[in-house]
Amino acid sequence: PARLKFLKSDNYEALLIKRIVQKFSLSFLDIEFNLFIDDKKTFQSSVIKEKSWDEKLLLRSTKVLGEDCLDNSIKISEKSEKFLIRGLLGIPTFNFSNSNNIFFFVNNRIVSDKSITSIIRVAYRDFLAHDRFPQLVLFVDCSSSEVDINVHPMKHEVRFRDLPSLKSLIINSI
């Protein structure tokens, strides 16, 4: 925050920082991340060499999300004319009370877009209770002409030129 008075407790701010480092860790699989808070290592992710992108993502996701991710996720990789989506989908029985375990990336950029979260909720609606959220690590790759990143000052939100096509691809894949 721009002003000291808007800072939360030290523990909460440390949690937010750790979450950002974890998101970057998922986005950049070929980079090692180490986070120290008060001289204690609170997060570490090593570089995994000579593995496929899918294997690297699974190992890194296990580091970020825990061992349960390994047994409760399904790999996804689907392509349309404009979009490539890939990542890990949590099985419906492995769900949460909030959306903290939904990680969404567009061209490796961390995105927290409510429209994408609602698309994911629609895709899971027949499998999850209304107040539950899946675990999901989803990457969308597309041409830069298909996405506008200048919607939000911090670039968290994006707008897609052909959102219906992306929505259809995500829903059909899930």
Predicted features and spans:
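N-terminal phosphate-binding caps/lids of nucleotide- and nucleic-acid-binding domains
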Residues: P1-I174
